[in-house]
């Protein structure tokens, strides 16, 4: 089968002819319709320090996708051939204390699809049936393909009550932008997002941010005055992994504020713990999605009118994967979709014909 893989311990990702994955008794096999490129995939492409320590070579990568079930293991119940599914990318052990207590998102032994085991940049993917999530009929393939990062945004944003609150999001990557959309949708008052990337800040405004702030050009304190904020932010969502952004967040938080952290610093960082202690701040770490409460919330948010469509900015056929990675690596993109439909090759990725418009929904 056709697949994208990390074949060599150097920069790049390559197309290869991979063997079909083997189906276990408790597994399902998914024929992939659409994949999306994650920031993690870019790290793997770049072969940075984290990738060198983490990624086995060679291996098929990718973990954002939607497809249909084409085979079912003999012990599987609840799924049928033809079901349209995405899947939870963290495969848990099922026997550690957290798993047995129903907190599988905190599994001590979780392994990642496309990180520790073969991934979804392939024509076919096999995962445990437990990890599959059936996509409602009124949610498009494109949105379903980005449920993994959308789930990160939902888990982070909905960690705290948002109604009427002032929210600061540091980091306008795709997850930060989707978190901004979630916050506004569920009733936050002001949603301020910060970054230094002008393209993504403009896109964040389209996603619903009250103010998108380029901290290289504006002071966050001036924006707070502009918005009539006198006591600081109630909620902080740290999405950047940048120590300077987190330190700025701590200074901008109101007393008793709550912070959820998804961004991963590249190295250990120091902060002024006095800001945390004397303000009585609550800090929560976020890793992935809650299984499967976050997935049901994702579906409900979209079904209740949350519009994520601006976040998908580029579309390519899988054979044009290099263009997709170039777009992601440029920093001038939102989410990039790779289509596995062979009919898609008849048109360009920006084609506006009726057939392509249908495929893009």
Curated annotation (Swiss-Prot):
The record marks 148 as: Important for catalytic activity for the proton relay mechanism but does not participate directly in the coordination of zinc atom. GO terms for biological process: L-threonine catabolic process to glycine. PROSITE patterns: ADH_ZINC. InterPro entries: ADH-like_C, ADH-like_N, ADH_Zn_CS, GroES-like_sf, L-Threonine_3-DHase, NAD(P)-bd_dom_sf, PKS_ER, Zn_alcohol_dh. Its EC number is 1.1.1.103. Zn(2+) 1 binds at residues 38, 63-64. Belongs to the zinc-containing alcohol dehydrogenase family. It is found in: Cytoplasm. Zn(2+) 2 binds at residues 93, 96, 99, 107. This is L-threonine 3-dehydrogenase. The active site is at residues 40, 43. It catalyses: L-threonine + NAD(+) = (2S)-2-amino-3-oxobutanoate + NADH + H(+). Its cofactor is Zn(2+). Binds 2 Zn(2+) ions per subunit. NAD(+) binds at residues 175, 195, 200, 262-264, 286-287. Its main location: cytoplasm. One of its GO terms (molecular function) is zinc ion binding.
């Amino acid at each position: 089968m056709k697949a994208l893989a990390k074949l060599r311990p150097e920069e790049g990702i390559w197309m290869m002819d991979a063997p079909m994955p083997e189906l276990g008794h408790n597994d399902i096999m998914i024929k992939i319709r659409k994949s999306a490129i994650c920031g993690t995939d870019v790290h793997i492409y770049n072969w940075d320090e984290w990738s060198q320590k983490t990624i086995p070579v060679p291996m098929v990568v990718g973990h954002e996708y939607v497809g249909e079930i084409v085979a079912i293991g003999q012990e599987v119940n609840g799924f049928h051939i033809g079901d349209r599914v995405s899947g939870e990318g963290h495969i848990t052990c099922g026997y550690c204390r957290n798993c047995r207590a129903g907190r599988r998102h905190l599994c001590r032994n979780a392994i990642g699809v496309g990180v520790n085991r073969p991934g979804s940049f392939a024509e076919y993917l096999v995962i445990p049936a437990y990890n599959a999530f059936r996509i409602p009929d009124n949610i498009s393939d494109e949105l379903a393909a980005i449920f993994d990062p959308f789930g990160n945004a939902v888990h982070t944003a909905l960690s705290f009550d948002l109604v009427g609150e002032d929210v600061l999001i540091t980091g306008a990557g795709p997850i930060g932008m989707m978190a901004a959309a979630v916050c506004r949708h569920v009733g936050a008052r002001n949603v301020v997002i910060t970054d230094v990337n002008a393209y993504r800040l403009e896109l964040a405004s389209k996603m619903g941010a009250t103010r998108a702030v380029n901290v290289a050009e504006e002071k966050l304190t001036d924006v707070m005055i502009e918005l009539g904020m006198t006591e600081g932010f109630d909620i902080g969502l740290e999405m950047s992994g940048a120590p300077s952004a987190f330190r700025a967040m701590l200074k901008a938080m109101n007393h008793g504020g709550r912070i959820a952290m998804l961004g991963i610093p590249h190295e250990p960082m120091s902060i002024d713990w006095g800001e945390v202690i004397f303000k009585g701040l609550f800090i929560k770490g976020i890793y992935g999605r809650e299984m499967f409460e976050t997935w049901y919330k994702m579906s409900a948010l979209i079904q209740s009118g949350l519009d994520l469509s601006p976040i998908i900015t580029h579309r390519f056929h899988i054979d044009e994967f290099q263009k997709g990675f170039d777009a992601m690596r440029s920093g001038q993109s939102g989410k990039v979709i790779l289509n596995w439909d062979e009919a898609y090759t008849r048109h360009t990725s920006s084609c506006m014909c009726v057939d392509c418009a249908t495929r893009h929904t």
